[in-house]
Amino acid sequence: MSKRRVVVGMSGGVDSSVTAWLLKEQGYDVVGLFMKNWEDDDDGEYCSTRQDWIDVVSVADLIGIDVEAVNFAAEYKDRVFAEFLREYSAGRTPNPDVLCNAEIKFKAFLDHAMSLDAEMIATGHYARVRERDGRFELLKAYDHTKDQSYFLHRLNQAQLSKTMFPLGEIPKTKVREIAAQIGLPNAKKKDSTGICFIGERPFRDFLNRYLPTKPGPMKTPDGKIVGEHIGLAFYTFGQRKGIGLGGSKSGNGDPWFVAAKDIASNTLYVVQGHDHPWLLARELVAGNVSWVAGEPPAEGFACGAKTRYRQADAACAFGAATPGPAGEARFSLAFDDAQWAVTPGQSAVLYDGEICLGGGIIESAVIGQPGQTAPARALAEAR
């Protein structure tokens, strides 16, 4: 009886390396696949692709599996990076990891793996897949401190049916222990913390290579000009550092935060104080919707939601929203408690306990506390 073939996405990191070893120990026919998603010539000294490939080969030799490299740089630029630039140009703050998972790691990579006669694919993500009544559910990882279901919420039934997450039941500390015990050459390698195409370079320097600067006024909610910004694309909601403002002599000395963008007038709005009403949203509207089960929750469904990675689930009620210009689905969330710095372009991801339901891209939010009159504006909505 032939072994079931599983193609493992190997990055050169500890998580994917331990994933490959675990599956090999469980008797699978494991093949490693290294994805090159960014051309070295585009990234110079900041990209670690060469060293990552060396680490993948070293690990594959140690655990006794075949490994190959595949270049998805063209697909990445077309499906992920181009959208990344479009969103920043529109004043929003995208999350390319979400799109990369949906379009590259679980689409282009999955298709390539199937061409290698694989039955399944596996990655080192911290999440879980559960089959129940013929349907597949995406669950949070056992180690909630490392849970990555937020980045995986756009996966569909076809993708989940072919996916394994061996680390979903294992604490990160145990993964490090396994790597050391079996002598992986990359056992002490640090976890990657940035987007590959940005690397360790200052983010503003990177973005400036692709987007033009367009200076404009920096104003307070009452219209007072307090400075000049270098371009709306270079700021994000809730940002404190890099604004160029100290404590206001006429104010209370509290730190300044980016609170809003007016695309039409090229104005950046800033406020003083972490809990300023302009930084607190009680409702949001999201588009570009994707549901793991293929259909949305019921109107009024009480759920939890994250509007950024590592955020605790915030209690809210799900609702339908006015469709987009082309009739595309949207949804709304009404939170029990106001949420801080809800950012257009980021993902709003819904949960029913441990189950990730799916989500969408935040388009706008209603700011201010209940009972207060919030400024009549949409947060960086430029659609």
From Swiss-Prot:
Top EC class of this enzyme: transferase
Sequence segments annotated as region (Interaction with tRNA): 146-148, 308-309
Active site (UniProt): 100 (nucleophile), 196 (cysteine persulfide intermediate)
Pfam families xref list: tRNA_Me_trans, tRNA_Me_trans_C, tRNA_Me_trans_M
EC nos: 2.8.1.13
NCBIfam families per the UniProt record, alphabetical: PRK00143.1, trmU
HAMAP family recorded: tRNA_thiouridyl_MnmA
Protein name: tRNA-specific 2-thiouridylase MnmA
Gene from which this protein is expressed: mnmA
